[in-house]
Curated annotation (Swiss-Prot):
Homology family: Belongs to the SIS family. GmhA subfamily.
Domain SIS as annotated: residue spans: 31-186
Note accompanying the cofactor annotation: Binds 1 zinc ion per subunit.
Needed co-factor(s): Zn(2+)
Zinc found in the keyword field: yes
Residues noted as binding substrate in the record, renumbered to the chain: 46-48, 59, 88-89, 114-116, 119, 166
One term of GO molecular function: D-sedoheptulose 7-phosphate isomerase activity
Localization of this protein: Cytoplasm
Keywords tagged on the record: Carbohydrate metabolism, Cytoplasm, Isomerase, Metal-binding, Zinc
The keyword DNA-binding belongs to this UniProt entry's keyword annotation: no
Name under which the protein is recorded: Phosphoheptose isomerase
GO biological process: carbohydrate metabolic process; D-glycero-D-manno-heptose 7-phosphate biosynthetic process; positive regulation of DNA-templated DNA replication initiation
């Protein structure tokens, strides 16, 4: 068991190289600026990434480390009526872009999540967001996959192992939540500085 833990920790440490950590800080800056300007964060993904989208939105709307004002974040994965009606009446490929079309405003942020970087519906949402003047964050494995074309702020894990990618994603968005919360509300961060 300890050998497995050691190998996993080495894989995670390797994923957090200097360029990836710099990209994380750029995303923190973007989210802080956009929240301060009154914009919102839209988040989407499929499967485990859908759960991550909801988790991430909950950290911003609820709280991460301390009580504070709610921050405007919406998981586009959470409304089963929208997801099923758009899938049924149109196609699953546009379940997120349709919501970006309805909810996104220039200056807002769309954060697309995918371990593969090939999720068609997330790609459509990223393209729609760019067309509407939203900032785009692409979080994916496999060096970004097809997300490379549409992500203004790439958070691409240089790994093909899905569990490793998901673990890096979790650590990344927890760090981002912590840093945004601490910067916007002038509280001392309790986490590890990267």
């Amino acid at each position: 068991m300890s050998e497995w833990v050691e190998q996993r920790l080495q894989s995670l440490a390797k994923a957090f190289d200097q360029s990836y950590c710099g990209a994380i800080e750029a995303v923190v800056d973007l989210i802080c600026q956009r929240f301060q300007a009154g914009n919102k964060l839209l988040i989407c993904g499929n499967g485990g990434s859908a759960a991550d989208a909801q988790h991430l939105a909950a950290e911003f709307v609820g709280r991460f480390h301390f009580n504070r004002q709610a921050l405007p974040a919406i998981a586009l994965t959470a409304n089963s009526s929208i997801l099923t009606s758009v899938s049924n009446d149109y196609t699953y490929d546009i379940v997120f872009s349709r919501q970006v079309e309805a909810l996104g405003q220039p200056g807002d942020i769309l954060w697309g999540l995918s371990t593969s970087g090939k999720s068609t519906n997330v790609l459509h949402a990223l393209k729609c967001a760019k067309d509407k003047g939203l900032h785009t964050i692409g979080m994916a494995g496999n060096n970004g996959g097809l997300f490379q074309e549409f992500a203004d702020y790439p958070l691409f894990v240089a790994d093909k192992n899905t569990p490793c990618i998901q673990e890096v994603h979790l650590m990344t968005y927890h760090h981002i939540c912590e840093q945004v919360e601490s910067r916007l509300f002038a509280q001392k961060s309790v986490g590890i500085k990267v």
